[in-house]
Structure formats: structure tokens, C-alpha cells
């Protein structure tokens, strides 16, 4: 029943997107444009509106974060990230997960403040406000097709973001309402994300782990557990790492937690030389998506996979080249960067000896 409800929401959200683009086209057709121009201008209007709404959504998080004591660290749209360091903004390109259109990262100064849900609700409040403004615009101007574009776009984004699945705002809000004790894990995850941008070489990954209650549930607790698992890998405690990720896999129903655990179990299989297990994990759709991300850590894993499992030297060199290019710009902390640099050097040595 839960899956049916989820699919129904996805179908409705997609239908609203289609209606938004249709409204945009009809709006320009009513202005007297030919069918072709109306379609082009309508499509462009809807597309630009989408990107503007993405920005407004993240600004909603930033505004509610400001009200509750968050310091702006980064604000991104697509591959572009605006990071605030020492009072100045710096623009850079970054790798993003698929389906992540924009992002806001804030750092909480007072972690005893429990109003994190207000910050997480900022984007949803923006969508509701924009729907009301679009309706008001429609009444005032009678341009209901232009208004309809924004109404349907915001309805679609609101539905997608309220759905308590994966890494949506709705999933995070639902988790913290069900498990308010997970707030401490949420702040740890936010602190980790912020420092990977502010001072990545001033911290180690082990600085962002903490004990997690055995019966803890939810993506924030699981994120801290996966960070602990990665620390085990960095410290060469492979058996402990394997147990940690398998434990997360067994109890989670969060797709992101599951995929990250499978990704690092792939890395462990490569370290242990278990090619069959590595092939099994690498064939998982979510893991494939991560391996396509152009960051140093993902491309080092990709290179080892191509070398040891696929025996594809061309793809191995391609992944290694990307890893070298992205080593300094990838959001890795000091011990992570050192580990993947050494693992890449080890692969280069094996390739040289093989030749």
C-alpha cells in the first residue's frame, strides 16, 4: 500500500509538470504567437520558472535557517556552488547526485536548539506561498495560464518534497518528528557537510563520528553509521567496516543509506579481491549512479573496479585521470584524501608492474 501511494504521488507530480508546460505554451498562444513560437517560448518560460523555483526553495531553507540561528555555508544550483568563507563568497563547480537540482548547507551555532524542523520546512513553505501568489496573480490579471504554470510547478515540487522517501525534506521532517532524539545525528551530518566545504584539510573524518544507539532508526543515524564504516576502511579495519555496512543494510528502509552501504561494500570487495561480490554490488543501479559521479573517491573506486573486475585498462586509465584532476576539488577531509591518494598510487604501481 505504501509503494502504491508513493507511485501515485510520483504520477501526480509528473502530471503537474506536464500541465505546467502545457499552460506555458497556451499562455503564449493566447498572446498571438504561432504554434511553434508559442511552444518554444512556453517551454522556455516553464523551464526558467523551474530553475527560479529551485533557487527560491533553497532560499526558503536559508531564510528559515537564518531565523533559527544557522550560518550560511553554501548555496548551489546544479553543478555551481556558492560557498561563504571568511565573509566572502566563492563560486565553484561541484559534482552532484542525480535528481538534486539545488542545495543549501548551513552550520548551526547552537546545537541545543531543536528547531531544525523549521529550517527543513523552509522550501515547502516557499512552494505553498508561491502557489498562493500565483492564484492571486491569476485573479488580478486574468492570465490564468501564466499563473497555472507556477501553480502546477509548485504543486509538483511540493508533492515530491513532502514525500517521506529518500533524502527529501519530507523524509527528514518525518524522521525528526518520529525520532526527535535523532536531532544530534542531524547536526553532526550538517557539521560534516559544512566542513567539507569550509576547511576540508583541517579535519579528519573521524572528527565527525559519534556513538549511535543500537536501536536508532532513520537516515541521520544511518549517515553517522556509514561515516563510521568509512573510518574503519580508512584505518584498515576491513572486517569491522564490513560488519558496519551490513548492519545498516539489514535494518534500513532508506534507499540512500542502502546505496551508500552497498557502494562501500563494493570497495571492501575490491580490497579483499572478491571480484564476484564486487560485480554483484557494481551492477546495482544506485551504485552505478555513484560510480558515475566525477569526484576523486568515486573515480578511484571506479578505476579499481575496471582494473580488477572488468580488466579494462582503457576505462581504468580514464577513471584514474578524472580522479587525479578532481583530487583537490573533491569534498574530502584530510584522512579521506590521503587514503584515496595512496590507493590511487597503489593502482598506478600495479599497472606499471603489469605493463
Predicted region positions:
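Small-residue-rich helix-interface/hinge motifs
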Residues: 44-108
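Structural signature of alpha-solenoid helical repeat junctions
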Residues: 220, 253, 257-260, 294-295, ...
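Alpha-helical repeat scaffolds
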Residues: 203-215, 238-250, 274-289, 312-326, ...
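Terminal, low-structured helical/coil segments at or just beyond the last alpha-helical repeat
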Residues: 319-355
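Polar-ligand-bearing catalytic/cofactor-coordination segments
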Residues: 67, 104-110, 165-233, 240, ...
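Alpha-helical adaptor scaffolds
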Residues: 226-236, 246-310
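Topogenic membrane-insertion module of multi-pass membrane proteins
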Residues: 1-46
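Hydrophobic transmembrane alpha-helical segments that form the core helix bundle
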Residues: 108-198
Amino acid at each position: 500500500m505504501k509503494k502504491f501511494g508513493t507511485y501515485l504521488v510520483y504520477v501526480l507530480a509528473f502530471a503537474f509538470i506536464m500541465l505546467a508546460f502545457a499552460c506555458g505554451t497556451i499562455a503564449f498562444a493566447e498572446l498571438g504567437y504561432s504554434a511553434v513560437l508559442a511552444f518554444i517560448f512556453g517551454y522556455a518560460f516553464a523551464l526558467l520558472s523551474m530553475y527560479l523555483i529551485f533557487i527560491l526553495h533553497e532560499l526558503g531553507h536559508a531564510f528559515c535557517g537564518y531565523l533559527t540561528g544557522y550560518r550560511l555555508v553554501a548555496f548551489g544550483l546544479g553543478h555551481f556552488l556558492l560557498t561563504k568563507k571568511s565573509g566572502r563568497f566563492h563560486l565553484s563547480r561541484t559534482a552532484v547526485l542525480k535528481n538534486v537540482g539545488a542545495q543549501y548547507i548551513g552550520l548551526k551555532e547552537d546545537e541545543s536548539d531543536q528547531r531544525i524542523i523549521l529550517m527543513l520546512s523552509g522550501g515547502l513553505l516557499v512552494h505553498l506561498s508561491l502557489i498562493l501568489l500565483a492564484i492571486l496573480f491569476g485573479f488580478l490579471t486574468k492570465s490564468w495560464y501564466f499563473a497555472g504554470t507556477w501553480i502546477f510547478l509548485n504543486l509538483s515540487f511540493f508533492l515530491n518534497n513532502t514525500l517521506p522517501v529518500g533524502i527529501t525534506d519530507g523524509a527528514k521532517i518525518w524522521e525528526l518528528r518520529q525520532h526527535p532524539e535523532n536531532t544530534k545525528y542531524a547536526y553532526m551530518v550538517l557539521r560534516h557537510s559544512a566542513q567539507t566545504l569550509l576547511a576540508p584539510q583541517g579535519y579528519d573524518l573521524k572528527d565527525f563520528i559519534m556513538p549511535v544507539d543500537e536501536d536508532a532508526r532513520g537516515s541521520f543515524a544511518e549517515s553517522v553509521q556509514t561515516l563510521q564504516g568509512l573510518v574503519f576502511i580508512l584505518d584498515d579495519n576491513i572486517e569491522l567496516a564490513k560488519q558496519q555496512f551490513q548492519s545498516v543494510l539489514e535494518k534500513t528502509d532508506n534507499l540512500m543509506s542502502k546505496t551508500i552501504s552497498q557502494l562501500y561494500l563494493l570497495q571492501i570487495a575490491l580490497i579483499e579481491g572478491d571480484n564476484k561480490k564486487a560485480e554483484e554490488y557494481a551492477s546495482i543501479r544506485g551504485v552505478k549512479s555513484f560510480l558515475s559521479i566525477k569526484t576523486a573517491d568515486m573515480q578511484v573506486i571506479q578505476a579499481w573496479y575496471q582494473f580488477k573486475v572488468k580488466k579494462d585498462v582503457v576505462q581504468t586509465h580514464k577513471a584514474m585521470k578524472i580522479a587525479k584532476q578532481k583530487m583537490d576539488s573533491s569534498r574530502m577531509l584530510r584522512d579521506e584524501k590521503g587514503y584515496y591518494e595512496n590507493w590511487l598510487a597503489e593502482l598506478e604501481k600495479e599497472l606499471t608492474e603489469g605493463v
